[in-house]
């Protein structure tokens, strides 16, 4: 979308002051710990781009607050590279750079904000190559330290800590399907047919590049088969998000030109787990 179209969408430039005012009206406040997802084009013409958005968020949450984003790794080996011909695998293993929390780019599919935030002075990024998060603020280290190698969306993950800290989730123009926190609900849900993946990626151990095997829910293709519950072409998290809003959970407002939502992290996880267990059927043990 060209500049004029964006300017018309937002009725002029969206400034740091305007964003901070709109975020405050939505309910974000001083001391909040918030994971945010942003679709920049939905916000309109943001004067200054990602730095303006981050600046406005920091203005609102203040020195006691913390910002968190999901990063991933843009150049991570694909899960299925171990199915390649052996010579191709060997070539990749020999020279593929190790994941480095400081140097490795955030997944471009997550938009511009994660990369902008993780580069900020004082930002901290978790150690997991496939499921890394970055945070900036008072609770940044507490959120990201010692990210579990296996089950990185489950207990003691940055997502679990966000919930435990009374954190929040902001969708700044991003669709409901962007609710990454629902992967934590998938990890916790006691429902049949849960799907897992095992994959290998290179990490740094005492300064040396080492290939390590990881185990996680299938966050790429879905931890469950939602096909009987979700219309074709629609993401399961979008449907869960709509049902959550219909139940009166979260706040909705306009930030810049963007339709935006603010949720309590615990509400998202509690609703997501209950939805999955009800719709997919609770797992039954022997004799259950």
From Swiss-Prot:
Keywords: Acyltransferase, Antibiotic resistance, Transferase. It catalyses: a 2-deoxystreptamine antibiotic + acetyl-CoA = an N(3)-acetyl-2-deoxystreptamine antibiotic + CoA + H(+). It holds the Pfam family Antibiotic_NAT. One of its GO terms (biological process) is response to antibiotic. InterPro entries: Amioglycoside_AcTrfase (IPR003679), Antibiotic_NAT-like (IPR028345). It is an enzyme of class 2 (transferase). It comes from the Bacteria. The keyword Isomerase does not apply. This is Aminoglycoside N(3)-acetyltransferase VII. It comes from Streptomyces paromomycinus (Streptomyces rimosus subsp. paromomycinus). The lineage of its organism: Bacteria, Bacillati, Actinomycetota, Actinomycetes, Kitasatosporales. The gene is aacC7.
């Amino acid at each position: 979308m060209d500049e004029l179209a964006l300017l018309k969408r937002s009725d002029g430039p969206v400034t740091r002051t305007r964003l901070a005012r709109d975020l405050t009206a939505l309910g974000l406040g001083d001391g909040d710990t918030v994971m945010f997802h942003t679709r920049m084009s939905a916000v309109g013409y943001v004067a200054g781009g990602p730095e303006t958005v981050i600046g406005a968020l920091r203005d609102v949450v203040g020195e006691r607050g913390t910002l968190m984003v999901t990063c991933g790794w843009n150049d991570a080996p694909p899960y299925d590279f171990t199915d390649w011909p052996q010579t191709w695998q060997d070539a990749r293993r020999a020279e593929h750079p190790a994941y480095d929390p400081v140097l490795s780019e955030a997944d471009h599919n997550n938009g511009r904000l994660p990369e902008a935030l993780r580069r900020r002075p004082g930002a901290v990024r978790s150690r997991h190559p496939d499921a890394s998060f970055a945070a900036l603020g008072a609770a940044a280290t507490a959120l990201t330290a010692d990210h579990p190698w296996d089950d990185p969306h489950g207990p003691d993950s940055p997502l679990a800590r966000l919930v435990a800290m009374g954190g929040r989730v902001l969708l700044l123009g991003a669709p409901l399907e962007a609710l990454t926190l629902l992967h934590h609900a998938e990890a916790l849900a006691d429902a049949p047919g849960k799907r897992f993946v095992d994959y290998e990626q290179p990490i740094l151990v005492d300064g040396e590049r080492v290939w390590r095997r990881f185990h996680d829910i299938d966050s790429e293709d879905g931890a469950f088969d939602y096909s009987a519950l979700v219309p074709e072409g629609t993401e399961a998290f979008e449907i869960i998000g709509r049902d959550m809003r219909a139940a009166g959970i979260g706040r909705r407002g306009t930030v810049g030109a963007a339709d935006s939502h603010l949720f309590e992290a615990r509400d998202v996880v509690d609703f997501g787990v209950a939805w999955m267990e009800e719709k997919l059927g609770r797992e039954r043990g022997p004799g259950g």
